Swiss-Prot record:
Topology class, membrane: Multi-pass membrane protein
Keyword Cell wall biogenesis/degradation: yes
Name the record gives this protein: Casparian strip membrane protein 6
Species classification: Eukaryota, Viridiplantae, Streptophyta, Embryophyta, Tracheophyta
Subunit structure: Homodimer and heterodimers.
Organism for this UniProt entry: Populus trichocarpa
Segments on the Cytoplasmic face: 1-23, 95-106, 182-186
Length: 186
């Protein structure tokens, strides 16, 4: 028997495929933890944001809280739901590390990740529009910028957007990774 050169597409491909799929599953797990931290931090940061202007009398005070605007409430709820989902999806991610050939759990994660991406991007985008108005105002509608008066409130709401948009980017990567892992099974 004569041994010839291995051509492209031949040879032992099951062992490297399993190793690559395991590496993808480990990266999936790490990204889920990163997204969990970002979305939970965003929800906590926004939910604990408030500021009272100090220069008014005891009878008249101006106070800014996150729940003054329904958009920020939606932002907190969306980030909280996504954080809970990410926490509960970690066992599926661990299962994919242990059983790198599992397809059904990856399909389930792709479907749920896509739904959570939609929810998170809706909450983050809506809050970003209100944060922009808080910083810039709108001259046409006579909405003045409030960030000149409520400095720490605006800094906190702006900062809470960062973790949420990091979560959006991580979800895009998670969906892409799961799609790559599923395509390698064939």
């Amino acid at each position: 028997m004569k041994a010839g050169p291995i051509e492209l597409g031949e040879g032992k491909s099951s062992a490297p495929k399993a190793a690559v799929n395991r590496g993808v599953a480990i990266l999936d797990f790490i990204l889920r933890i990163l997204a969990f931290i970002g979305t939970l931090g965003s929800a906590i940061s926004m939910a604990t944001t408030n500021e009272t202007l100090p220069f008014f009398t005891q009878f008249i005070r101006f106070r800014a809280e996150y729940d003054d605007l329904p958009t920020f409430t939606f932002f907190v709820v969306a980030n909280g739901v996504v954080s809970a989902y990410l926490l509960f999806s970690l066992p599926f991610s661990i299962f994919n590390i242990v059983r790198s050939k599992a397809q059904n759990s990856r399909i389930l994660l792709i479907i749920l990740d896509t739904a959570m991406l939609g929810l998170l991007s809706a909450g983050a985008s809506a809050a970003a529009a209100i944060v922009y108005l808080a910083h810039q105002g709108n001259v046409r509608t006579n909405w003045s910028a409030i960030c000149q008066q409520f400095n720490s409130f605006c800094e906190r709401i702006s900062g809470s957007l960062i973790g949420s948009f990091i979560g959006v980017v991580v979800f895009i990567l998670l969906i892409s990774l799961s799609a790559v892992a599923l395509s390698r099974h064939k």
